[in-house]
Amino acid sequence: MVHALEEIHRVTRPAGTVIEIHPAAVEFPLLEVKSNEELSFSEDDPGFDYGKDSLHAEKAVATVIGRGLFVLDDRRRFELRTHASSLQELRDHWAVADAYDPEEKEETLARLREEMYARAHEVLERSPGAELEFVEPAMMSRLTPSAKP
């Protein structure tokens, strides 16, 4: 990722801005069931398996800032929320999103995620008008390229 940020520096300086976004490295995503903003189910996603990738992203950003290629203008945590009215709708979303991931989920993690989905589905079925929310903590950095080549 450092190489990619070096290349981005080359094409964006002197007047560009880079918005770098990646999943938070130390916080688990979670699945919630809500009805009228009332939380009736919340569990960490046991299928979370990209912590190392997130740490690599953190280190890459720190590396290019440390080398003076970019100035950190702002950095903040936010939550990327995916809403679904049914478990099938959430599965359809993940089928599209995961199509770009060349790695299959480890069998144990996939099974644990399915068990969580089943528990969420039970709560969803008992709560008319409720919806699922997949909450993914993320980090966003606004970087300005320095004049340094």
Language-model region placement:
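Conserved Class I S-adenosyl-L-methionine
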Residues: 66-149
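Conserved catalytic/acceptor-binding region of the Class I
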Residues: 9, 15-83
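Short, structured coil/loop segments at alpha-helix boundaries
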Residues: 4, 28-34, 41, 101-110
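A short, conserved alpha-helix within the catalytic core of class I
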Residues: 1-8
